[in-house]
Design a protein with these regions (language model features):
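A glycine-rich, hydrophobic loop/mini-helix early in the fold
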Residues: 1-9, 13-16
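Short, amphipathic C-terminal "tail helix"
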Residues: 108-116
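Unchanged
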Residues: 12, 16-106
Length: 116
């Protein structure tokens, strides 16, 4: 869960960020997860190809790295982000999807995952 300035409210979102020059999406995902949550991405099971964030408004693209994380949550290392990481059961996610705001891609992934 993180505070996003544009909507001016807290939304549920996956850790994310820009891919630095010379980084692969997998290296970037490991770095971003560590920076934003303190967790280590220790196993990658899939990398989902490029998609557009808002195809009608922007050429910004996304990639999704799927894997397993371990460790203890730690405060974000960024002074520009307010992030509250957490673990959720599938039942908790199904309830959150009914009552809380999500980033669009996070909402879609959580919907599918929570029903498996």
């Amino acid at each position: 869960k993180e505070f996003r300035l544009a909507p001016g409210e807290w939304v549920y979102n996956f850790p994310a960020g820009l891919i630095d020059p010379g980084e692969t999406p997998e290296v970037s995902a490991r770095r971003e997860l560590m920076e934003e949550t303190g967790l280590e991405l220790y196993e990658i099971s899939d990398t989902i190809g490029t998609s557009y964030s808002a195809v009608g408004f922007s050429n910004e693209t996304n990639m999704c790295v799927v894997g397993k994380a371990r460790g203890e949550f730690k405060p974000s290392t960024s002074t520009l982000e307010e992030i509250t990481p957490g673990w959720y059961t599938k039942a908790e996610v199904r309830e959150l999807l009914k009552t809380e705001k999500f980033a669009a891609r996070t909402q879609a992934f959580c919907y599918v995952w929570s029903r498996q």
